[in-house]
């Protein structure tokens, strides 16, 4: 598929040929969902914790005699039935991460890129560079391109001035090509790739 290339100023800068094997697939929601779940599970802290009955400090003395009181037969005040007792089957500190094959992750990324291209949310610019690291100037460029909620992916390294100017703009994320991922692609309305990013993706998946 062929896509027009623009500059940050909104001027035409030719066109680029995109591989159908990366940007022209019929998106599979199941693959994309698996990859997003994998990413979110991996980043979850897992620091939740409650105390069980073995971790509660209370006397071990029997609360009252076994028979003759009319009450249920209790032997410990640490059980979950009582206020201040231990939690039954409560959460413990653990990792929520699970495995996902590398081939599935790579395929999900291609389907996420294809989904953006199919929905018209893919924009290719010639480069992401600024002479001055001025947020106001970059906001003007973005408004000209109609970008209010976007992920911008550059080549191997993001231009320092561009990254500095963009970090104060809400709903705008900037990543190098190594950081491109399914979740960040989907959470923004537009995906903006530089020509360097397109070349890197073509080389990665060829």
From Swiss-Prot:
Keywords: Ribonucleoprotein, Ribosomal protein, RNA-binding, rRNA-binding. SUPFAM superfamilies: Ribosomal protein L4 (SSF52166). The keyword Ribosomal protein applies. GO terms for molecular function: rRNA binding; structural constituent of ribosome. One of its GO terms (biological process) is translation. GO terms for cellular component: ribonucleoprotein complex; ribosome. The keyword Iron does not apply. It comes from the Bacteria. Part of the 50S ribosomal subunit. NCBIfam families: rplD_bact. One of the primary rRNA binding proteins, this protein initially binds near the 5'-end of the 23S rRNA. It is important during the early stages of 50S assembly. It makes multiple contacts with different domains of the 23S rRNA in the assembled 50S subunit and ribosome. Forms part of the polypeptide exit tunnel. Belongs to the universal ribosomal protein uL4 family. This is Large ribosomal subunit protein uL4. It comes from Nitrobacter hamburgensis (strain DSM 10229 / NCIMB 13809 / X14). The gene is rplD.
């Amino acid at each position: 598929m062929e896509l027009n290339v623009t500059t940050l100023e909104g001027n035409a800068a030719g066109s680029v040929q995109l591989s159908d094997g990366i940007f022209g697939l019929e998106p599979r929601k199941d693959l994309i969902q698996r990859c997003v779940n994998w990413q979110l599970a991996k980043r979850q802290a897992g620091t939740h914790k409650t105390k069980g009955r073995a971790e509660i400090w209370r006397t071990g003395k029997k609360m009252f005699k076994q028979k003759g009181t009319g009450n249920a037969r209790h032997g410990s005040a640490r059980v979950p039935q009582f206020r201040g007792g231990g939690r039954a089957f409560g959460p413990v500190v653990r990792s929520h991460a699970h495995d996902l094959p590398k081939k599935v992750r790579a395929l999900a990324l291609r389907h996420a890129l294809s989904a953006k291209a199919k929905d018209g949310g893919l924009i290719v610019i010639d480069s992401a560079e600024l002479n001055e690291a001025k947020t106001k100037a970059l906001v003007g460029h973005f408004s000209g391109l109609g970008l209010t909620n976007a992920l911008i992916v550059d080549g191997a390294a993001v231009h320092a001035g561009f990254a500095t100017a963009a970090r104060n703009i809400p709903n705008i994320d900037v990543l190098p090509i190594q950081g491109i991922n399914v979740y960040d692609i989907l959470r923004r309305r537009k995906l903006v790739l530089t020509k360097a990013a397109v070349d890197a993706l073509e080389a990665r998946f060829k």
